[in-house]
Amino acid sequence: MSVYVGLDCGGSSSRVLAMDDQGNVLFQGQSGAANLVSTPEGRLRRNLTNAAKGCPKPDFVCGCFAGLISPQTRERGIGILEDTFGVPASFRAEPDYTAALYASPEADICVISGTGSLVCSRNNGKIVKSGGRGYILGDEGSGYSFGRDALMHFLQHPEDSTAYLRTQIEDVFGSLDESVLVTGVYKAPSPATILARLVKAVGHDAAEGVPYATESVQRHMRDLAALVARHVRYHHASSNQLSISLAGGVWKASAQFKEAFLVHLKAELPQVDWEMHRLLRPPLYGAVELAKELNHGN
């Protein structure tokens, strides 16, 4: 019996799943961030070691990493996996979005909106992507972009902020004092990650019709829809019917995000018949499918 291990290594957390040939779950583990670009090396290795603690000896391993952006980072990812498990096995490293796409094989396009954002799909047997440039150069419609709007609204208009937003900020930062909040963002190992934790507040406030939140949802979902439209025009121009799988924490935070996204997407590409659903299986299962390909010689 072979043991297949998949890892979903993101900017907020890392998860490990081991399964056998029959699809039985043998192990699940979780720890902190494991982004190959933004997570410090020592912390990344400790987090993966903690997430994999107790995992049975693997035969085939695939780690899907945020921050895997070059052949060099791929090789680094493979080396980290080899060190983490410390046993003879077959290893591969792929970008984190590949796991989400493989977890939803029935979808034409996967739109990921978590801490960051990215659009990916299959085209002529290859996986193609748009976006994914990080919170400084992109991440349209990401948890970071909404969380930043939420915190900025509070800092600029604390007296007009809802009780829900105030509670969420205090839960994340432990204070409502401006100096503590600003310091907390800039001293965070990943500013994007800590700000993304405020996305639920934006969804809640948008549902209540609070202006800053409704404007934030409309603006960022318009940008994300425009990114998807560019992806479709370039990679799926002849398609008049497309299915989209929505992955990431933003879609779980509130129905407001999906509703606004669909409105703007239809405005961008009115000729396309859209079918849209939340990712039905966690990306971890896609990572396991990628590990299985190692056994099939793909």
Regions found by a protein language model. Give the residues of each.
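Glycine/charged-rich beta-loop-alpha catalytic/anionic-binding loops adjacent to active sites
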Residues: 82-86, 92, 127-134, 266-275
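Glycine-rich phosphate-binding loop of actin/hexokinase-like ATP-binding domains
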Residues: 106-157
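Short, conserved acidic/polar surface loops in the N-terminal third of protein domains
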Residues: 72-76, 102-106, 121-124, 257
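Conserved phosphate-binding catalytic cores of ATP/NTP-utilizing and phosphoryl-transfer enzymes
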Residues: 1, 88-111, 125-126, 236
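Short, glycine/acidic-enriched loop or turn micro-motifs at the edges of active sites
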Residues: 11, 99, 117
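Glycine-rich beta-strand-to-loop/alpha-helix junction loops that act as flexible
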Residues: 62-69, 113-116, 242-252
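ATP-binding/phosphotransfer module of carbohydrate and carboxylate kinases, centering on a glycine-rich
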Residues: 1-57, 103-109, 151-298
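Short beta-strand-loop/turn "lid" adjacent to the catalytic site in phosphate-handling enzymes
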Residues: 36, 53-92, 243
